[in-house]
Amino acid sequence: MAKILVLYYSMYGHIETLAEAVAEGARRVSGVEVTLKRVPETIPAEAFAKAGGKQDQKAPVASPQELADYDGIIFGTPTRFGNMAGQMRTFLDQTGGLWASGALYGKVGSVFSSTGTGGGQEHTITSTWTTLAHHGFIIVPIGYATPELFDVSHVRGGTPYGATTIAGGDGSRQPSQEELTIARYQGEHVAKITAKLKS
């Protein structure tokens, strides 16, 4: 059975919501076991609460070493100036031992993201791919295989690189049904490829 990890960081809940949709999509594929986890918070609890961070996230916290236990990993991170959030960066910076042993080589990897106003969403995904490439991941984008990506009639996230959501400058916009559909597609697509490679 192929094992998929959906690993995310979410401060305000937008990425958490996308992560749940990604995991839901991956679970549609038979012969796949899906786990949803998050990376540790690095902001002190008091500052996190003061900033309005979402404190009731149910997903357990992952450790870097356990990444080796999965056949495919789908990473979710908000955009911070066109790059992954510092919490995800800190987590991945602890995978040097896995890199040295080649423990992640040949695993399937994919990325989804969120932004406040849309700026940097694609670059966040592709810049995260750099870390995955150093580990030897087989990187899987979603392409334009889902019709929602062609809808330009209103504001929405979603790219051929991976699912995204646009939260708005104040974070009040929640992921739309279209964005969640794209996220589910990404999970299902990555799970299918992982299962094929595992068989």
From Swiss-Prot:
It catalyses: a quinone + NADH + H(+) = a quinol + NAD(+); a quinone + NADPH + H(+) = a quinol + NADP(+). This is NAD(P)H dehydrogenase (quinone). It comes from Serratia proteamaculans (strain 568). One of its GO terms (molecular function) is NAD binding. Belongs to the WrbA family. NCBIfam families: flav_wrbA, PRK03767.1. PROSITE patterns: FLAVODOXIN_LIKE (PS50902). Binds 1 FMN per monomer. Keywords: Flavoprotein, FMN, NAD, NADP, Nucleotide-binding, Oxidoreductase. The lineage of its organism: Bacteria, Pseudomonadati, Pseudomonadota, Gammaproteobacteria, Enterobacterales. Residues 4-190 form the Flavodoxin-like domain.
